[in-house]
Amino acid sequence: MTIHIIITMVLLLAFLIGSIWYAKKKYQINLAVLGLGAVAFFVSSQILEKLVHILVLHPQKDGSIALLQDNPLLYIIYGLAMAALFEETARLVFFKWLEKKRSLEKADALAYGLGHGGLELVFLGLTSLINLYIVLSAVQTQNPQVMQLLSENMLKTIQSLSVWQIYLLGFERILALGFQLLLTVWVYQAVRQKKWTYLLAAYGLHAFFDLAPSLAQVGWLTSPVLVEVILALELVLVAYGTKAIFCKKS
């Protein structure tokens, strides 16, 4: 099982590096913009958003959240709103700032999207897989120190994990990267064209994409395959809509 985790990590890393290399070669993206996109993701979602979660949700040491147990619908709405608010506002702030420095270019949207989505892939994809590798290795060797830290439900989940679920996790991260690129286009166009309905659309589209995983998190959507199918269909739909709206306008 652990070998499949390693393969998935290698594939994700290769996909990310390959995407950046291709974008740099074909579209001459600015690597500084890419780096700032990564910084914007880290500050908005890993610092500011998590700080709000701590203040509002009061997560316990074991990771449990009272709102998730008591009112899952409100928890979903809160999670969707916070993720969209922080990440899309980070895009807005960045492009407004960049616009004051110089004229915006099409490649800026691609560069920022790869930076923002790329670091998300690392944090939510590679980091999760590394943690899973460590825990799974400890369970297989019956490491007593780690076994004591695992709840019964978590232990059952790990022991029942299938190979295809590991690759499915990698597939979801690739879909998420694609969606981050599309969302960046919407905010970029909002700033460039001064049409703030595009910004509102970006907030809504972000929540739209996060809905299926949120439903799965609270147990209302139990099929991992169905979640990924929904995400893939959403990505195709939004990509088509984005191209139809902006292809001739950009």
List the model feature ranges, each with a label.
Residues 1-250:
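Hydrophobic alpha-helical segments at protein termini of multi-pass membrane proteins
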